[in-house]
Structures are given as structure tokens and as C-alpha cells.
């Protein structure tokens, strides 16, 4: 239409801005805990700009720039604008994305094709499908139209196994993790770290069992045939998404507290094992008393 003179670029941009406004008509009422955890009017309507096609050719075009400009104009939460960047991304496109970042509205999110495409291949996607990935929800990459991706299948607290190392797997008198030994007897950081990994392995195994049970329940009790009709190869296989009909099937738990866990492990290594500034006995006592919070000095 623009080439034929039926539409000016300015009016086309205005139409795009109107779509952005319309996307914010939706809202979701949440309970108090969810509202706190998902604050910011997030509905996870993710939209991708830039990137490459299945043949490895850059697909950045005028519409890519207009998407960024729309977010700059309306300054609204939706859509969750993401940009795919790689070695073939036009410099002008990266500058435009940076201009949106500079506004401070938290958009766009940047996704590195050079890392994500190989990671998807490692999970069984063909190179062509991996190149054609998009982002769903907040941060999860997948090949749309071919994937049953159960994202946010669980929230895994990365710090919880570390806490259990100090109690030999006991919580409030109940043995909920493996017995990894008395933490005060761990003479090296490697011993401590091995105990942490053992606690994590045990907890993750429980998580996998729970997610698998839910998957089976969904397949048996809550199949979604209409949704299956829009995803390859459900019809060909005669299975719904929940029964494994899609070309790719993934369950994606989220790891939470990664930075806190890394900080905690480093603090233990540095202060207890490397510099001997605190004993493991004193650290354990400090943790058990929440560093003295709420305790009377007398």
C-alpha cells in the first residue's frame, strides 16, 4: 500500500500504535500473592522483531522498526517487545532498539541468536526450526506451531538445597532431603559443594516426578483437541498436545534465586574455607537464629 501511494508511513505507524494500545485493553485479575509476584500489568503477550529465517537470512524490515517505534510512542506494558540480535543484524536496527532501551520502560528484551539457536539444536530441534524460534511468555524460546511447551511448570528455589546442607536434610524435625552429613565436618569447599549438589539432585528428582504426574493427568483428564489442531504433528499422530502429539514436547521448570545461590556459595567458600574469617559452626548458628534478628540482647 505504501509503494502504491495508498498509505503513508506516518499513518501506517499510527495504525501500529493503535494495535499497541488495543493490546493493553486486556487485564487479568490475580490473587494477592500472584499480583505481587507478577506485578507490572504483565500478560506476557510477547512480540518478536528482527532475527533470521530458517535459511539463516536476516529478516529485519520496516515493520521491525515500526514495532520499536510503537513502543516508544505509547509507553505501555504490552506487548512484551523482544528483539532477536545476531551477527547479521543491521546496525541501524540495533541503534533503534537501544533508543527504546534508553527510555527506561524496560523494553525491549534482547535475545542472542548466536547462543539460543545452538541451545535449541542441543534439545533436538532441527537447524531450520531453531533459526525460526520465537519467545513465548516472558523469556522462553520455542518453535511456534510445532511445540507443546509447558513453561513455568514449577518454580524451583535454588537456595533451598543450600539451606538443607546446613541441617543434613532436616527441616523442622522432618527428614525432607538426603543425609549429606554434618556440615561442620566438611573440611573442604568441594565437600560442601558436593553436598549441595546432592540436595539439589534429590529435590529436582521430586520436581520431575510431580511434573510428569501432572502431564499424565492433563493427557487423561484435560486434553485440548482444538489447540492440537493448530500444532504439528498432532493430527498426523492422532494425539492431543497433552498426549505428545506435537513435534517437540518440553516441560520447563524455572530456577529461582540463582544469583542469591551463587552469592551464598561464594560467601561460604571465601569466608569459611579460603580466609577462615568465620567457622562453619558459627555460620550455622547465625543461620539458625536468622543472624540474631528478633533476639533480645539480654
Where are the model-predicted features located?
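Conserved catalytic cores of very large enzyme subunits
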Residues: 1-298
Amino acid at each position: 500500500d505504501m509503494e502504491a501511494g495508498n498509505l503513508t508511513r506516518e499513518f501506517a505507524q499510527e495504525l501500529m500504535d493503535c494495535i499497541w494500545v488495543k493490546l493493553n485493553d486486556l487485564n487479568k485479575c490475580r490473587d494477592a500473592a500472584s499480583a505481587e509476584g507478577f506485578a507490572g500489568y504483565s500478560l506476557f503477550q510477547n512480540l518478536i522483531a528482527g532475527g533470521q529465517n530458517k535459511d539463516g537470512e536476516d529478516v529485519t524490515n520496516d515493520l521491525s522498526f515500526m514495532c520499536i517505534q510503537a513502543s516508544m510512542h505509547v509507553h505501555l506494558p504490552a506487548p512484551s517487545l523482544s528483539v532477536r540480535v545476531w551477527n547479521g543484524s543491521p546496525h541501524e536496527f540495533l541503534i533503534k532498539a537501544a533508543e527504546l532501551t534508553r527510555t527506561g520502560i524496560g523494553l525491549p528484551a534482547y535475545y542472542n541468536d548466536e547462543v539460543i539457536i545452538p541451545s535449541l539444536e542441543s534439545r533436538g530441534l532441527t537447524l531450520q526450526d531453531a533459526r525460526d524460534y520465537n519467545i513465548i511468555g516472558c523469556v522462553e524460546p520455542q518453535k511456534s506451531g510445532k511445540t507443546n511447551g509447558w513453561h513455568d511448570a514449577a518454580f524451583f528455589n535454588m537456595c533451598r538445597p543450600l539451606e538443607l546442607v546446613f541441617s543434613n536434610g532436616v527441616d523442622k524435625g522432618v527428614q525432607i532431603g538426603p543425609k549429606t552429613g554434618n556440615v561442620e565436618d566438611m573440611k573442604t569447599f568441594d565437600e560442601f559443594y558436593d553436598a549441595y549438589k546432592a540436595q539439589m539432585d534429590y529435590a529436582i528428582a521430586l520436581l520431575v516426578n510431580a511434573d510428569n504426574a501432572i502431564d499424565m493427568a492433563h493427557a487423561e483428564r484435560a486434553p485440548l483437541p482444538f489447540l492440537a489442531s493448530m500444532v504439528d504433528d498432532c493430527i498426523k499422530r492422532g494425539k492431543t498436545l497433552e498426549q505428545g502429539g506435537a513435534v517437540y514436547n518440553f516441560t520447563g521448570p524455572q530456577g529461582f534465586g540463582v544469583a542469591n545461590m551463587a552469592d551464598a556459595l561464594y560467601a561460604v567458600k571465601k569466608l569459611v574455607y579460603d580466609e577462615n574469617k568465620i567457622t562453619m559452626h558459627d555460620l550455622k548458628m547465625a543461620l539458625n537464629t536468622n543472624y540474631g534478628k528478633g533476639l533480645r540482647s539480654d
